[in-house]
Each structure stands twice: as C-alpha cells, then as structure tokens.
C-alpha cells in the first residue's frame, strides 16, 4: 500500500477520488492500493520553553537556546498552560500507523516551503523511516494531479527547501521566545509580544505614525486660470510653480489679468507605448486587490486559497510573475476559455497572440505566476 498525505482534508478528498481511494475511514480514505490521509496545517510544532524545563519569565533563564529543538503535537493554551490538541494527537496516530505500514509515502502537502515543513516535522516526530517521494503540482485540477502522480520526484530533491523552512521556524522561536520574555521582564507590566516579522513591521508602522504626527503643513499659493476656449469650452490651467509668499503669486496673477487673453504658442503630441504588466504573484495580487477593492492582504490570500482549492486558479502563494515555455503554450487555450464566459466574452479578442513578456524559464521559482486553470466556475 502507498500512503498519500495532503495538507488539508479538502485536497485529500480530490486526490483520493482520482486514485480510487473511495472508502472513508477514520482520518483517511482507502482504496485502489492507496491510503490518502491529511494534516490540518502544522500538526507538529517546536516545544514551548516548559518543554525544556524552563518555566515562567525569569531573567536568569535568558537566553533560552535549546541544544536540540524538541517536536511536539500542536499545543492549545489553557488556564494551566499549554497542552496537546486532542484532535491533532488522534490524527497523528492515524498518520503514523499508515506511514509505518506503507511501502512508500507520497508527499502531497502544498508545494512550497511551509508545506514541506508540515510533512518533514510529522515524519521526524513519528520516527518514520519509510521512503517518500514528492508530488509537486501548481494546481488541483484533475489533469494536474494525474500528471503530477506520473512524474513523482525523489523526496531528497527538496531537502534544502525543508532546511530553509526549518531555519525559519527555529529563528522565529528564538527571537519570539527570548524577545518576548526579555521585553516583558524589562517593562515589568504584562506581556509584550516580540516576533521576527511582527516587531520590525510594527516599528515601520510606528515610524510612519510619528512622521505624520511631526509633519507641519505649510501654506502655499498657486495660480489657477480659467479661460474661454474654442466652441465655448472652458479651459483651465494651473501653474507648476508654487509660492510661499502671496505677493509673488499676486504679481504674476495681475500680469495675466492685464493681458486679458491667453495664446497657445506650442503644442506637442507624442505617441507612447506601454508594456503589458507582468502576471500576478501573490504580493502584486494583494496590492491591486487592496487598491481597487479595499481587501486586506489576508482577505486576498484567503479568497485566492479558496479559488485554488476549487481548482479555478493555480497555486496562490507563488513569488514568481513569470511562466515557463510549456505553460505559455497553453495560454491561447486559456484565453479562448475565458472568452466563452459571458462576463468576459467582449474583453478577449479572438485569436489574439499573447505577449511573451512574462515568459522566462529562468525566472520561475517554485511555482509559476498566478493563472486561471480553465475549469469552469459552478
């Protein structure tokens, strides 16, 4: 039997349907020679300080730097401290049993740094030695999953990706735990959270806040003129220059007023070409969604993730705005598909030649730029 592990139940359900694992068991699907199970996010995490015998916020305990980090099931906070999440513990038992009884494991967690860490932490925590291979796909369409299953890659290919995620996880722990305890002890009033990302971000917000508070507006004078143009139109002009003193502005104003009319002495017309924008990565999608619709970054990611899980777009957490040649070859089909949708049919030119500006194999990272998949929305 082969075990496939996905990052969440909804993805496991899609993969199970494709491989014929139609029998539902507690914590997994089975059938067709496969067991398809799932995590729900990070089932395993780094232990909190009390897992190393360090309790409370005590100055003499700092810095807390474990010789070896300990992995534990995901914890929930209670009045008496942290304890393992019972649902997580149950799912880990299911996964361990499946891992230990399989000939090999197919890793189908999200194809990215955190998805790799979710599996590797589980793998190490359960003490598993079963060989594993990687399913690496950029969308959840049936076609993409089937192609991915035909082209499974050796798990060791992603060792460096795991090590990068592990370094991120451990650095977050070291900065967060030690920074929070040190600041809270020094301040002496409650708990002050410190984080590797959140604290520099908060500092930037505070810096902008104080820049705004310290800003002193200065009054200026500017010349605005409205004059009759051709065909009874009103033509308005504004001076590019601004004056701090009213007298300087009034001097020019009086000269214009005395002239009584304006004459166009020079007119230029220039033709400019503008490059089409690159395709979206997650960051540019979030920026545009915020500008046009007021979405927060989290709202955009959540919406994109749902569209991905419904097979409508490719992997949303991409950091690339480029696509490889083989994906570019599919773009005419995608444009034709979009043109069949009622709300878009007037916006897509028939047989349009797509631009190649976003085509560059060398600039594609783990995943290519965001694209629609060609699946029709329900």
Segments predicted by a language model, with ranges:
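Generic beta-strand/beta-sheet core signal
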Residues: 7, 39, 108-110, 226-228, ...
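Long, highly charged, low-complexity internal segments
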Residues: 35, 43-84, 192-305, 309, ...
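Extended, highly charged linker/hinge segments and catalytic-adjacent loops that couple domains
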Residues: 158, 162-163, 174-176, 303, ...
């Amino acid at each position: 039997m082969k075990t496939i592990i996905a990052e969440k139940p909804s993805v496991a359900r899609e993969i199970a349907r494709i491989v014929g694992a139609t029998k539902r068991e507690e914590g997994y699907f089975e059938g067709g020679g496969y067991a398809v199970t799932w995590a729900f996010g990070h089932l395993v995490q780094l232990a909190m300080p009390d897992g190393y015998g360090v309790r409370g916020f005590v100055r003499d305990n700092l810095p807390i730097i474990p010789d070896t980090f300990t992995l534990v099931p995901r914890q929930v906070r209670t009045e008496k401290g942290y304890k393992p999440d019972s649902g997580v513990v149950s799912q880990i038992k299911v996964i361990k049993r499946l891992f230990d009884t399989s000939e090999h494991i197919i890793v189908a967690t999200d194809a990215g740094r955190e998805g790799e860490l979710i599996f590797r932490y589980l793998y190490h925590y359960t003490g598993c030695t079963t060989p594993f291979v990687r399913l690496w796909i950029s969308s959840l369409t049936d076609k993409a999953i089937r192609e991915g299953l035909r082209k499974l890659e050796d798990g060791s290919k992603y060792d460096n990706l795991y090590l990068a995620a592990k370094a991120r996880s451990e650095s977050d722990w070291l900065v967060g735990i030690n920074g929070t305890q040190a600041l809270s002890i020094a301040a002496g009033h409650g708990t002050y959270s410190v984080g590797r990302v959140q604290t520099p971000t908060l500092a930037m917000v505070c810096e902008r806040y104080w820049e705004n508070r310290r800003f002193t507006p200065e009054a200026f004078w500017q010349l605005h003129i409205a004059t009759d143009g051709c065909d009874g139109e009103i033509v308005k002009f504004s001076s590019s220059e601004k004056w701090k003193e009213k007298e300087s502005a009034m001097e020019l104003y009086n000269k214009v007023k005395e002239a009584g009319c304006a004459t166009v002495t020079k007119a230029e017309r220039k033709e400019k070409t503008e490059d089409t924008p690159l395709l979206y990565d997650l960051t540019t999608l979030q920026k545009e969604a915020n500008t046009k619709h007021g979405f927060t970054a989290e709202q955009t990611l959540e919406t994109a993730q749902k569209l991905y899980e419904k097979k409508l777009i490719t992997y949303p957490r991409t950091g690339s705005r480029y696509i490889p040649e083989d994906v570019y070859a599919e773009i005419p089909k995608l444009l034709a598909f979009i043109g069949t949708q009622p709300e878009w049919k007037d916006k897509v030119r028939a047989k349009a030649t797509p631009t190649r500006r976003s085509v560059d194999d060398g600039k594609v990272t783990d995943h290519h730029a965001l694209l629609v998949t060609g699946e029709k929305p329900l």
